[in-house]
Amino acid sequence: MKRVFINDIRDIANASREKLFAQSQSVGRDRPLVIMHWTAGWGDQLFDDYHVSVTTDGKIYIAEDSFAETLSHTWHLNTGTVGVTMCCAVGADTEDLGEEPPTDSQIEVFSQVVAAICDGTWLTINKDNVLTHGEAADSLEFYDPEDLYGPRTTCERWDLEYLGTKESPIFNPWASDGSRGGDVLRGKANWYHNYWAENAKKA
C-alpha cells in the first residue's frame, strides 16, 4: 500500500479513464462506476481489495498504481469499477457503528477522493455512477431480484448506509430526505468538485 494525496488520485484516475471505460463496455455497461465501502475493520487497518483506502486520521492509500486493475471489492461488479473505502466500523451494526465509526476528517477526505476520481474519469457525481456497496447491492441495474443483498433486502452488505453524524444519524435505507450515507457523501463530493472548479477559474 502506498500513501498518496488528492492530486495523485486525480492523476491516476485520469490515466485510468480510457481503460476503465473499455472494461465497462466489455461487460455491457456504458460507464465506469465508483463503489464506496467501509472495511468493517480498525481505523488504520488496510486491505488490498480496494483501490483507495482512507484511514480515520484522513490519510489516503492506494493498492495499485492504476484504478483499472480489477480488485475484489464488490460481488460480480468489479470490472471497470473503482473501489474506495473508509477504514472504520469494526463491530458495527445497524444500531451502533462500533468502536471505530467514521470520523469527520475521514468523511471529508473520502468525499474529496470520490470527487477527484470522478473528475479524472469524467463521471458526473450522482447515484447512477457513484454508489455505496449497499446501494449497488440493492440495484436492479446490476443484479437479478433474487440476487439482491443490500440494506433494503437481505442486509448482507450495508456499507456507509449511515455515518453516525448529524447529517446521517441512523440506519434508514428507505429515507428520502438525503440522510442516507451515500446521499451525504455524494453531496460532499459534489461540493468539492464545484469548489475546485471555481478556484480553477480564478487561478
Region spans (language model):
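Basic/polar, cationic surfaces and motifs that engage anionic cell-wall
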Residues: 1-28, 92-203
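Residue-level marker of positions within ordered structural domains that often coincide
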Residues: 41, 57, 89, 115, ...
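Peptidoglycan-targeting cell-wall enzymes and recognition modules
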Residues: 51-104
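Short, conserved "active-site rim" segments that organize catalytic pockets and cofactor/ligand binding
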Residues: 1-70
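Structural preference for beta-strand elements that scaffold enzyme active sites
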Residues: 33, 81-83, 129-131
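Short, solvent-exposed loop/turn segments at the edges of secondary structure
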Residues: 29-31, 47, 77-81, 125
